[in-house]
Amino acid sequence: MGLSGMSANMEFGKAFTTRPTGLHGYYKYTPAVINKVDRTPAGVTIVQGETMDQCAIFIALAKKTFTFNNKNEDQYIQYATDPNIIAYGELPSGAATEGDGYVEFNIPLKYKNLTDQPTHIIVVCSSSKYGDYMTGGVGSTLYVDDLSLIYDGTPTIWE
């Protein structure tokens, strides 16, 4: 059975009220060639059977929860423009990790301003960057370990 035509309602956000400066952790990623393509985001070119999958790890702070259906792209969260998102950060590269060990990462949160307080946190770790479009490589594997929020330093302003 393929994934084409399947849909899911997703709910993002858990109650959370502090203002960290980033997300720290370790990951190990082994991608597969993308062999399942239902849809792709505008501006993204994927050649089924040739394009390597990518992982996605990101964090957002919000003023609400978000519920959307993965088949309705109009409901997808627009992190840069949604006024309910107050901070966002993502792993810069979703490429494969080298060797057998885990790779350390630090994702700085970029705040839209220094005054808004979050009510919810969103953390997403996906072995297929476009999994919400039902597109990815069967067999892509992402392991994540020892996630922690960082509270040191001055918050970065989103520009």
Features from the language model and the residues they span:
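Extracellular carbohydrate recognition and processing domains
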Residues: 66-118, 137
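Short coil/turn motifs at secondary-structure junctions
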Residues: 30-32, 64-66, 112, 128-130, ...
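Extracellular carbohydrate recognition
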Residues: 99-101, 117, 128-152, 157-158
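Extracellular-facing segments of soluble proteins and assemblies that are Gly/Ser/Thr-biased and enriched
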Residues: 1-67
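Residues that flank catalytic or metal-binding motifs in active/ligand-binding sites
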Residues: 19-21, 53-55, 103, 138-145
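Extracellular beta-strand-rich recognition modules
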Residues: 23-27, 31, 118-132, 147
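Generic structural detector for well-ordered beta-strands
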Residues: 15, 106-110, 148
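Terminal processing/anchoring signals of secreted or surface-associated proteins
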Residues: 25, 158-159
